[in-house]
């Protein structure tokens, strides 16, 4: 990678973006309106006293040993690693469908080291976890969101979907929360944040309020709405796994902090409800959830297609694995994997959560084979290895515990459990935006054809496209985007594989009706060859 790539993109970006108080009642008699006022006044006093008493009730305290804390943290990291490796061969190969029982799911001692050697990109979710953990280790728990955003933008490994869109946004000057907001990131409802939120729960053991605080702040880098709730949910499950023993309890408690009306919350709540209806039949629960919640409306690659990277549906498969796995490590990651879709990310999460709940020492030995061979591995550009992650997490967890009223006496740790945490405010992505059409374009922007016009009817669009000719990695294309005769912006397309723009053209919240989109590539070159594959069109009403 040439040193000037980031600077070049930033400069290109700068060029584009430059264009009354209550009266005290008088009680003369206890009749008529005076009596009503007296009763109301008395009720207010009693309510205030009751609230005061509740506020001053002694907090419940939870205690565990230092060894147990470290064992659970290690179980969380190792569980992620194993779950990811186990489910990697099936990633998105079973889209919106169950992996049938007739299809064996293999695991052997060499699977983990072999995958990491031959296909390290499979573990990209864990790499992001390690990237953020490494940043916190160097800068502390008070690390600002912009520092984590900067670290993500300069990561020296490939990213996808919402994470890659966030990296691109940050590099062109869109800071969090804009980098993760759906108006700037079509993948805001994807499962990217829940794939990278594990570390938050592992450094916040039993501390649900701090977990939410960190997750809200850091999750805005790459997500909003349901995508943000997905990461908060997963982080809370990890945190709660330190203080509870039943997966069902983790899910019940994590749901309490989410807005009840969010699609994400409703989906997971229905998983729990159907688990109680069909406690021995996870496939029945899967069918019900897939039928009702299986349509992806945000991710341009998944709209009107079986591919589903949506946060709520993939979190549902994680939840099914946890509930029907009932604390058994092998059963948990197996069921999660058989739910299909983003199998490796989902099994990494369910494996990490159940690994935290059990602790490293209680993960069956057959799953730990091959672990020693990969412990020293560090992702490219990072100073942290899988082996170091638990000890760094422990250091940050102890700091977090002390900051939140906990005490560390020798090898005994205790901390207060905060109750009645208010649910998060409701935020809805793609509000009044329903996919109406997915249309093949098969257009090119090049030196020969440097411009094109696309007509559509609706309130928004997203175009899947890419650079298809091999060009120098430090080259950056700029494409003007004009809607109905007005410059709506410009898309920057870096050629470097780590910096590519995953969804180069999109715009939402247009007035309903017919529109004309004009695209023109700037500074044409013989090497320019940009494919415009298909357009997803949105409208205020769902497609019939």
Residue ranges and their predicted role:
Residues 180-188, 199-207, 216-221, 236-340:
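Accessory "access/gating" subregions that flank catalytic or transport cores
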Residues 70, 78-79, 128, 133-232, ...:
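Active-site cavity-forming subdomains of large catalytic enzyme subunits
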Residues 467-540:
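Beta-strand-rich ligand-recognition modules
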Residues 89-120, 126, 149:
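Active-site-surrounding "flap" and adjacent substrate/cofactor-binding loops of secreted or lumenal enzymes
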Residues 48-60:
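Bacterial Sec-dependent signal peptides at the C-terminal "C-region" and cleavage site
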Residues 93, 97, 105, 319-397:
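Catalytic phosphate/nucleotide-handling subdomain of diverse soluble enzymes
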Residues 410-458, 466-472:
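Glycan-recognition and processing domains
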Residues 38-48:
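Bacterial N-terminal signal peptides
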């Amino acid at each position: 990678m040439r040193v000037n790539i980031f600077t070049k993109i930033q400069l290109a970006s700068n060029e584009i973006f430059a264009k009354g108080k209550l009266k005290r009642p008088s009680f003369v008699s206890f009749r008529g309106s005076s009596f009503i006022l007296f009763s109301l006044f008395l009720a207010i006093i009693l309510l205030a006293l009751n609230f005061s008493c509740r506020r001053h009730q002694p907090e419940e305290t939870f205690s565990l040993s230092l060894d147990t804390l470290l064992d659970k943290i290690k179980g969380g990291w190792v569980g992620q690693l194993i779950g990811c490796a186990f489910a990697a061969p099936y990633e998105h190969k079973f889209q919106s469908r169950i992996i049938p029982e007739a299809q064996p799911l293999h695991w052997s001692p060499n699977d983990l080291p072999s995958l990491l050697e031959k296909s390290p990109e499979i573990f990209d979710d864990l790499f992001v976890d390690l990237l953020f953990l490494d940043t916190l280790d160097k800068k502390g728990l008070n690390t600002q969101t912009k520092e984590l955003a900067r670290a993500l933008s300069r990561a020296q490994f490939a990213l996808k979907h919402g994470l890659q869109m966030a990296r691109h946004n940050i590099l062109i000057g869109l800071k969090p929360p804009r980098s993760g907001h759906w108006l700037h990131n079509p993948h805001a409802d994807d499962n990217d944040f829940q794939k990278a939120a594990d570390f938050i729960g592992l450094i916040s053991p039993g501390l649900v309020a701090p977990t939410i605080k960190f997750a809200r702040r850091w999750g805005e880098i790459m997500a909003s709405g349901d995508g943000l709730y997905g990461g908060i949910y997963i982080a809370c499950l990890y945190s709660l796994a330190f203080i509870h023993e039943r997966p069902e309890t983790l899910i019940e408690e994590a749901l309490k902090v989410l807005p009840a009306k969010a699609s994400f919350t409703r989906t997971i709540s229905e998983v729990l409800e159907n688990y109680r209806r069909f406690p021995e039949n996870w496939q029945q629960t899967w069918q019900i959830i897939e039928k009702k919640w299986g349509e992806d409306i945000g991710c341009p690659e998944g709209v009107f297609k079986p591919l589903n990277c949506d946060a709520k549906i993939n979190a549902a498969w994680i939840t099914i694995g946890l509930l029907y796995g009932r604390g058994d490590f092998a059963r948990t990651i197996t069921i999660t994997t058989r739910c299909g879709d983003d199998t490796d990310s989902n099994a990494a999460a369910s494996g990490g959560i159940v690994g935290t709940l059990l602790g490293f020492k209680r993960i069956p030995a057959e799953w730990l084979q091959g672990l020693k061979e990969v412990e020293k591995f560090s992702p490219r550009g990072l100073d942290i290895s899988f082996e170091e992650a638990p000890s760094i997490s422990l250091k940050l967890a102890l700091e977090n515990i002390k900051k939140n009223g906990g005490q560390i006496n020798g090898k005994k740790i205790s901390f207060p459990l905060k109750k009645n945490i208010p649910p998060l405010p409701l935020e809805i992505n793609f509000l009044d935006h329903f996919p109406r059409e997915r249309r093949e374009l098969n257009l090119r922007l090049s030196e020969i054809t440097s411009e094109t016009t696309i007509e559509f009817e609706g309130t928004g669009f997203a175009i899947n496209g890419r650079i298809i000719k091999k060009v120098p990695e430090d080259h950056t294309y700029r494409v003007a985007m004009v809607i109905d005769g007005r410059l709506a912006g410009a898309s920057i397309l870096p050629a470097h594989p780590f910096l590519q723009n995953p969804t180069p053209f999109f715009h939402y919240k247009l007035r309903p009706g017919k529109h004309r989109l004009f695209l023109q590539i700037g500074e044409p070159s013989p090497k320019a060859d940009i494919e415009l594959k298909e357009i997803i069109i949105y409208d205020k009403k769902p497609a019939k």
